[in-house]
Amino acid sequence: YEILSGQKEKKNQDSEVSVKNKSSKKLKKPSSKNGYPLVIRNLDSSVEDTIPYVTNYTFSKKSKSLAYTTTGIKDSIQAGVYIKNLKSNSIKHVYSSHDKAKYYKLSLSDSGKNLAFVVDADSTKSYNRPYELYSWNFKNDKAKLVVNKSNSPRGYRVSSDGNLKFSGDETKLYFGLALPEIVQDTLLLDEEIVNVEVWTYDEPRLYTIQEMQLNNDKKKSFKTVFHFKDQKLIQIGSKEYPNSILTDDANDDYALVYSTEPYQLSSQWTGQFSKNDLAIVNVNNGLSKLAIKGNPSPASLSPNGKYAYGYNQVDSTWYTYNIKTSKYTELTKGKMFYNELSDYPNHPRSYGAAGWTKNDKSILIYDRYDIWEFNPETGLNKRLTKGREKQTSYRYVKLDSEVKYIPVNKKILLNTFNESTKESGYYEFDVKTSKGNQLLKGPFRYSSPKKARLSDDLMFTRQSFEEFPDIRISDLSFTSEVVISDVNPQQSDYNWGTAELMHWYSLDGIPLTGMLIKPENFDPTKKYPLLVNFYEKSSNSLHSHRAPNPGRSSINYSFYTSRGYVIFNPDVHYRVGYPGESAFNCVIPGVTALIDKGFIDEDNIGVQGHSWGGYQIAYLVTKTDIFKAAESGAPVVNMISAYGGIRWDTGLSRQFQYEHTQSRIGGTPWEFPQRYFENSPIYNIDKINTPLLIMHNDKDGHVPWYQGIEFFVSLRRLGKPSWLLNYNGARHWPLKMQNRKDFNIRMQQFFDYYLKGAAKPVWMDRGVPAIEKGINQGYELIK
C-alpha cells in the first residue's frame, strides 16, 4: 500500500476534496487544523480509497492495519480515532471526541492488536493542557483511559511529546511524563515584563546553550511504563536520571538511566559532552542502583538486556556491566582498540562495534583493521579476521534490519577497505570457522548493500573519480551483477579527470599520502596550474565520485580539472600545540615534491580551503610566498579571541576546541600563551604577499564571522590585495543555490585571473558598492 497525503495539493484542488457541512452549508477546507485527505492506494490493483480530514496516521509493522485520527464530517463521519483493516477494508471507531480535539503520538503495536495515543480534548484555552493517555486492545470496542492528571505521579503530567512504544510482547506501554509547564502571568502588561538574560558562572549549561535547547527543554519527558496485566505504572526516568535507554524490543526487565548534568559545566572545556552517571532501573518495580559514576562515554544495552556496555574513552577500553551481578569487565584493556591515528589532545575514540551474537553470548568489536569476538563475562577473545597483516579493514554489513543479532549459523557479508591502495570490496565470512572469501574488490568505493526483504537480491553502488555511482543489482555471491541505471551519460562529452595517490615525506620525516587529480587529457610534458585543497586527512576518499556542482565551500575537482588545473589534496599529520606548523610541514614539501615532477607551473599555484582548512591557509600564507593566490573560507585568524567565542549554532563555548579537539592547542591561553600567539595568523599579517579571497558569512554559527572581519580589515589596513564575501543571512556555508553559484563563479574568476592570466572581473577591480548589491554582480571581464 502507498499513502498519498493531500497536504501538498494545490489550492485549486481543495474544492475537489472539500465536503459541504450540511447544517452550515459552508465548505470545510482541508488544512492543518481540519486535516487533509488521506489516499490509500493498493500497489497491486491501483485501487484507491480516500479518508477525509485526517490529522494523524500510522501503520502497524506486521499486520495490514492503519490507525488514523480525523476531525470528521458532521452528520456523516464522527471525529475521533479509527482503525482500518486494509485486508478486509473494515473500520473500527475506537475513540470519539469533538472535532477540536488534538491527538499526539498515535502508535500501533507491531501486531496491530494494540493502539495508544495522547489526546487533549479540553476545549478551553487553559495554559496547562490536560493531556490524557489512552490505549485500545483488539478485544475491546473502545479505547480506555490509561493515565491522566488524577493518577499521574505527584508533580507530573502526561507528556504530548514523549514517544509511545509497546514492548515486543505487547504487555507493556512506554510513554512520557513531564513536569508542569512554566507559564507567564497573563495579567502582566508588556511594559511590566523584564527581558534580561542572567548568566551564572556555575550553572551546568551556559545560557546560550539553554537558549538553543529551549524547545527540547519544553518538550522534556521522563520515560514511564504501564503494565497492562496488573494495571501498574512505573516511572523509569526522573529529574535525577532524566535519560533512559531500553532494548530494541523493550521486553526486558531493566532499563538504563543516566544523567550528564553533573559534568555539563566542565564539558565546555573538556569536550566530554557525554560523560554521565549511569544507573539501572527495574521496570517491574522501579528499584534502581548506581552502576557507573562518571562514565566518560555513552552506554548501550545488549540486545537481550543482560549487559550494559560501551567504550571508556578515558581508559581506551571497551567494557561490559552485568546488570544482575553488577560485574564490570574490561574487555580490551592493554589492547589497541582505540584510534591509533588520533592526533587530538584528547583521549582517542574507538573504531566501534559490529554487534552481538544471539542471547548476548558474545560481542564483536572492531580494532583498526579486524573484528574480534569477546566473551562479555570473562573478556576471553579471539581475532576473527586477518586484516592487520594486509592493512585491510573488515566491517560488518547488516543486511536485515529486523535481526537483532549477528548470525553465526550462516555466512555474513563484510565491507573491506585497504588503507594503502584505498581499494574496497565485499567479503563473505563464516564467524564459526573464521574463514572467508573475497567476493569483489577493486579501485572503487563500494556502498553498503541493501538486501531485498523477500529474496537474496542486493542493491549497491560502486564509484570512482571517473565512474558515477550507478545502481547495481546482484545476488549474495556478486556473480550476477547488473547495472540498472545510467545517470550521467553526458560525462563522456567532457574532459573529466583521473585520481591517483601521491607519497612524500613531511619536513619532520613523517611518510605522507595525498590525492593528485589530473585532467583527463594530461600531458606530462606540459606545465599545469596547481590548486591545493585540503582539510585534515582526505586520501581515503580517493575513489569518491565528484559530480560537477556549485559546492558550498570547496572547489569542485571535476570542474577545475576540466578547465586544465591539477589538484593536490595532501593529508596532514598534527603535532599538539603546533597545528599551523604541522600544516606547513606537511603541505609545503608535498607541493615542492610535485614541482619536482616537472609538470606543475611553479609560478601559478593556488590554495583553497574552508573552516579548519581556511585557518590553515591563513597560517600558510604568513609563512610562504609559494602560493600566487589563496581562498580562505571562514578562517580563525586570532585564536585568543576565538577561544572566548561562542558556537552560535549550538550555544557551546569554543574553549573545548582549543584545549582538546580540532584546534589542537592542548590547553588554555593562560597555560600556553605562546602557542596561541604563534598559531594566530593575525600577528603576522604584514608578512602576507599572497592575494586573498575570503568568504565569511554574518550568521556563521561555527566560526565567529568577526574572525573574517579581523583578517580582512588587517589586510586592508596594509593595502594587501584582498576581497571579503559575506552572504547575508548565510551560516557557515552558503546554502541557497544562487549564493553557491555566485561563490563558485567568483572563486573561478579569482583563480583564473591569478593562475591562468584571464581577464580581471569588475568586482575584483572596483568591488560591488552597497548601492549596487543584488543589482550588479560585477562578473563582467575587463578587456
Regions found by a protein language model. Give the residues of each.
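Beta-propeller folds
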Residues: 1-457, 463-469, 473-474, 761, ...
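Hydrophobic/aromatic beta-strand patches that form the interior of the parallel beta-sheet core
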Residues: 3, 67, 224, 234, ...
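Composition- and surface-driven signal marking solvent-exposed, interaction-prone regions
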Residues: 53, 96, 187-188, 236-239, ...
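Short strand->helix junction
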Residues: 73, 101, 122-124, 521, ...
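Active-site lining segments that contact anionic ligands and/or coordinate catalytic metals
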Residues: 161, 351, 360, 366-369, ...
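Glycine-rich His-Gly loop
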Residues: 260, 417, 463, 533-537, ...
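Cap/lid segment of the alpha/beta-hydrolase catalytic domain
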Residues: 334-340, 344, 478, 486-604, ...
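Active-site-proximal cap/loop segments of hydrolase catalytic domains
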Residues: 547-783
